[in-house]
A protein has these predicted regions:
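Glycine-biased low-complexity/repetitive sequence motifs
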Residues: 1-49, 56-63, 67-420
C-alpha cells in the first residue's frame, strides 16, 4: 500500500503537523474496517456510510487518524466505533458528519479513553482571494491596481476578495471647486473685487493592506466592497462670476459608495459660500461673513473656511477660498488679496499629487498683490484663473477690472486595492 509516514499527522490537503507517529494509508477505504494503531486512513463514503472500529485493548499512546477522502461525510457519515473504550470520556461512538473533516485520536487511559488531539476541515485552510474590478482608467503600481474616474462611471466588483488577500479599497473622493467671484469691472479704487472659490471637499481612506503615503486627512481605514456595481459621481466645478452677476456658483458633489464630498463654496454676494471648503469674502467696504468649510460636517474634515476681510478701506482686495488643509487667506492693505488655502497631497495615484486648493482673491485697483491659488489646483486672482481640471481647485476671484473670475476645477475619484 502507499503510505505517508515519518512521525507526522496529516491534518488536511497537503498540511502536516508533528503530533505523533502515524503512517497514512493512501489507498482509500470504501467500507467498514478495524483500524490499527499508528495508522491513518482516507475514508471514501461516496457510495455509503460505514464504521471505522478502533483497536481493541489499546495502550496509552496508541494513535489513529481518519480523513474524509471525498468530502462526502456530511451526507454519508463516518462512524468511529469505540470498540469497548471511551471516546472523549464518553461510552459513545464518534461520528464525522462534516464535509472534509479529519480527526486524529490518541488513547490516554481507561477514563477518558481516546482523545481527539487534532481536527480540521478543508475549509479551515483559506486561500488568499483578491479584489477584481473594472471601471475608470486602470493603472498598476506594484501589487496594487488604481482606478481613476475623471467623469461619471461605475466601479464594477466581480470578486470581493477575502481578509487573507484583500477585501477593502483605498479611496480619494474630491468634489468640484467653487467658482470665483466677479469684480465690479471698473478701474476704480472703490470697486468691488471677487473672493476666491472654495476647493471641493476632499475625503481619503487608506486600506490597512495598502502602503502608499496618504494625506493628513486620511481616514482610519478604507472601504470594504462586495460584488456589485458602485456608481461613481464626479462633481463639476462651479461657474465663474462676472461683473454682472458677480456671484460664483458652488461646485458639485463627488460620490463613491458611502463617501460623499461636498462641492466647494462659491461666492454668493458679500458672504463666502459654504461647502467642502468655503469661498472667500469679496473685497468691499464691509467685512462680510466667512464661508464655512466642512459643510456638511464629516471626520476627518473635508475642508476649511474661506478667508475673511481684515481691511475694509479702499482699494478693496478680496479674500481667498478655503483649501483641503488650510483656510483661505485674508486681504491686506493697498488692495492686496488673500491667497487660496492649500490643498492635500497624497500618493494614492502612485506619485505625490496635490488636490483641492482654494482660489486666490482678486486684488483692488490699482492692484499690486493678487491672491495666489492654493496648492492643489486653486486658481490665481490676477488674471483670474480657473481651478485646475480634476483637482477640485477653487476658481480665482476677479480684480476690480476686468470683472470676470475663474471657474472651479472639476473633481476626481481614485480607488486603489491590492490585486495580487
Amino acid at each position: 500500500m502507499g503510505v505517508v509516514s515519518c512521525g507526522t499527522t496529516m491534518l488536511d490537503q497537503g498540511v502536516f503537523e508533528n503530533i505523533g507517529a502515524v503512517t497514512w494509508d493512501t489507498t482509500a477505504k470504501t467500507s467498514g474496517f478495524t483500524a490499527v494503531s499508528g495508522n491513518g486512513y482516507f475514508c471514501n463514503t461516496t457510495s455509503s456510510a460505514f464504521t471505522v472500529t478502533l483497536p481493541s485493548s489499546p495502550s496509552a499512546g496508541d494513535i489513529v487518524g481518519i480523513k474524509d477522502y471525498a468530502n462526502t461525510a456530511d451526507t454519508n457519515n463516518i462512524t468511529i466505533g469505540r470498540n469497548g473504550s471511551n471516546i472523549q470520556g464518553q461510552a459513545a461512538d464518534f461520528v464525522i458528519n462534516t464535509e472534509g473533516r479529519s480527526v486524529v485520536l490518541v488513547y490516554v487511559d481507561g477514563t477518558q479513553g481516546w482523545k481527539v488531539t487534532s481536527s480540521s476541515q478543508a475549509t479551515d485552510i483559506v486561500s488568499p482571494q483578491f479584489i477584481t474590478a473594472t471601471g475608470g482608467t486602470v493603472t498598476c503600481c506594484g501589487d496594487f491596481k488604481i482606478h481613476t474616474f475623471t467623469s461619471p462611471g461605475t466601479f464594477c466588483v466581480s470578486n470581493a476578495g477575502n481578509a487573507e488577500g484583500s477585501n477593502s479599497v483605498s479611496y480619494m473622493v474630491v468634489a468640484g471647486g467653487g467658482g470665483g467671484g466677479g469684480g465690479e469691472g471698473v478701474a476704480d479704487p472703490t470697486a468691488v473685487t471677487g473672493g476666491g472659490g472654495g476647493a471641493g471637499g476632499y475625503r481619503e481612506g487608506k486600506a490597512s493592506t495598502d502602503c502608499y503615503t496618504a494625506s493628513p486627512l486620511n481616514a482610519p481605514d478604507g472601504l470594504p466592497v462586495s460584488v456589485q456595481g458602485y456608481p461613481i459621481t464626479v462633481g463639476g466645478g462651479g461657474s465663474a462670476g462676472t461683473s454682472s452677476p458677480r456671484e460664483g456658483a458652488n461646485g458639485s458633489a463627488s460620490i463613491f459608495s458611502s463617501i460623499t464630498s461636498a462641492g466647494g463654496g462659491g461666492t454668493p454676494g458679500i458672504t463666502g459660500g459654504t461647502g467642502g471648503s468655503g469661498g472667500g469674502v469679496r473685497g468691499a467696504c464691509s467685512a462680510g461673513n466667512v464661508g464655512a468649510g466642512n459643510t456638511p460636517p464629516v471626520s476627518p474634515p473635508q475642508g476649511n473656511p474661506g478667508g475673511i476681510l481684515t481691511v475694509t478701506s479702499s482699494p478693496y482686495g478680496a479674500a481667498g477660498g478655503g483649501g483641503a488643509t488650510a483656510a483661505g487667506g485674508t486681504n491686506g492693505p493697498g488692495g492686496a488679496a488673500g491667497t487660496g488655502g492649500n490643498g492635500a497631497t497624497t500618493s494614492i495615484s502612485g506619485s505625490p499629487t496635490a488636490y483641492a486648493g482654494g482660489g486666490g482673491g482678486g486684488d483692488g485697483f490699482p492692484g499690486t498683490t493678487s491672491g495666489a491659488g492654493g496648492t492643489g489646483g486653486g486658481g490665481g486672482g490676477a488674471p483670474p484663473y480657473n481651478g485646475s481640471t480634476n483637482t477640485g481647485g477653487g476658481g480665482g476671484g476677479a480684480p476690480a477690472s476686468p470683472g470676470t473670475a475663474g471657474s472651479g476645477g472639476s473633481g476626481i475619484v481614485i480607488i486603489r486595492y491590492k490585486f495580487q
